[in-house]
């Protein structure tokens, strides 16, 4: 279980957050010769203090350019603590990526129930987890009593809903159909966005055959010529 303590702002835009990760994930967070810790600090301009018991303290510094740097570092640490490898966790540096953590205990009534539900999410030989990942593009980690998801906003929400469907007892077939429908919606939405952009580009090219070689000017003469 991850414990997070927020100490607000200290000085100007310098926050401190303290959280705890499993002891067996401390080595992964530090990395070989401290490379993972150093990468997080360099990418976000923060400082990490990592104790052997799994307590991690994150400090904002004068080097951070992103006002959300401490929060992003917190989510990266949480993701590693929830079983993700550093390469995936570091995607959370981007504003486009988010982390969701689902507590299996919220859906279980006993230890046996927790094991059964974990098995449903993972699937035989990992099939269910891989299917969720392949249809959403998000990354899924089942670790301890949690399911964690990293990815772009919309895919993460779809993957989260699929995981919660399985935890609530929906069949794998029903869950997979849901994922297929949502994937088709995303593909259609992206196609429409691409089509609109292509239409605009094509129209502009017809209006300005050499538009890549000229500067865009919007004086009155040019507007009249275009009309």
Swiss-Prot record:
Coiled coil: none annotated. Keywords: Repeat, RNA-binding. Residues 14-77, 106-163 form the KH domain. One of its GO terms (molecular function) is RNA binding. The keyword Repeat applies. The keyword Transmembrane helix does not apply. This is KH domain-containing protein MJ0443. It comes from Methanocaldococcus jannaschii (strain ATCC 43067 / DSM 2661 / JAL-1 / JCM 10045 / NBRC 100440) (Methanococcus jannaschii).
């Amino acid at each position: 279980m991850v414990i997070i303590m927020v100490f607000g702002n200290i000085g100007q835009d310098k926050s401190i957050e303290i959280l705890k990760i499993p002891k067996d994930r401390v080595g992964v967070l530090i990395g070989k010769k401290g490379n993972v810790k150093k990468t997080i600090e360099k990418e976000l301009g923060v400082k990490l203090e990592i104790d052997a018991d799994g307590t991690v303290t994150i400090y904002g510094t004068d080097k951070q350019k992103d006002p959300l740097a401490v929060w992003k570092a917190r989510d990266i640490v949480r993701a590693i603590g929830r079983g993700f490898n550093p390469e995936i966790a570091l995607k959370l540096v981007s504003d486009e990526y988010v982390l969701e953590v689902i507590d299996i205990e919220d859906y279980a009534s006993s230890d046996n129930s927790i094991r059964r539900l974990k098995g449903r999410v993972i699937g035989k030989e990992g099939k269910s987890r891989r299917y969720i990942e392949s249809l959403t593009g998000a990354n899924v980690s089942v670790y301890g009593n949690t399911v964690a998801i990293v990815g772009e906003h919309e895919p993460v929400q779809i993957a989260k809903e699929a995981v919660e469907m399985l935890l609530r007892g929906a069949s794998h077939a029903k869950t997979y159909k849901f994922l297929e429908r949502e994937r088709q919606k995303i593909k259609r939405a992206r196609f429409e966005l691409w089509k609109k952009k292509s239409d605009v580009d094509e129209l502009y090219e017809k209006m300005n055959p050499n538009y890549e070689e000229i500067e865009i000017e919007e004086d009155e003469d040019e507007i009249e010529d275009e009309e």
